[in-house]
């Protein structure tokens, strides 16, 4: 009986952990804040910032992309950390 209860406890913990989805902001520049659930077990959110002819631009989303010189990027690992 104890073994069965322990097994059920372990299965419950594993299932709850596998169901976790990181949530990141995904609005662009000065738009109203929105969020998205990241897919594929993604563990990072990013905030990318650069300047063009319109001024400073901001992009947010899931992942941690590589960027070219002159583009600032901040990556983080907690829910909605890229605001």
UniProtKB/Swiss-Prot annotation:
Any one GO molecular function term: toxin activity
GO CC annotation, single: extracellular region
Database matches in Pfam families: Toxin_cobra-type (PF21947)
This protein's record includes keyword NAD: no
Tissue: Expressed by the venom gland.
PROSITE patterns (UniProt xref): SNAKE_TOXIN
Disulfide bonds: 24-45, 38-62, 64-75, 76-81
Protein keywords: Acetylcholine receptor inhibiting toxin, Disulfide bond, Ion channel impairing toxin, Neurotoxin, Postsynaptic neurotoxin, Secreted, Signal, Toxin
Source superkingdom: Eukaryota
Signal peptide: 1-21
Subcellular location: Secreted
Alphabetized InterPro entries for the sequence: Snake_3FTx, Snake_toxin-like_sf, Snake_toxin_con_site, Toxin_cobra-type
Site location (May be critical for toxicity): 54, 57
Gene3D superfamilies per UniProt: CD59
Job description of the protein: Binds to muscle nicotinic acetylcholine receptor (nAChR) and inhibit acetylcholine from binding to the receptor, thereby impairing neuromuscular transmission.
Family: Belongs to the three-finger toxin family. Short-chain subfamily. Type I alpha-neurotoxin sub-subfamily.
UniProt protein name: Cobrotoxin homolog
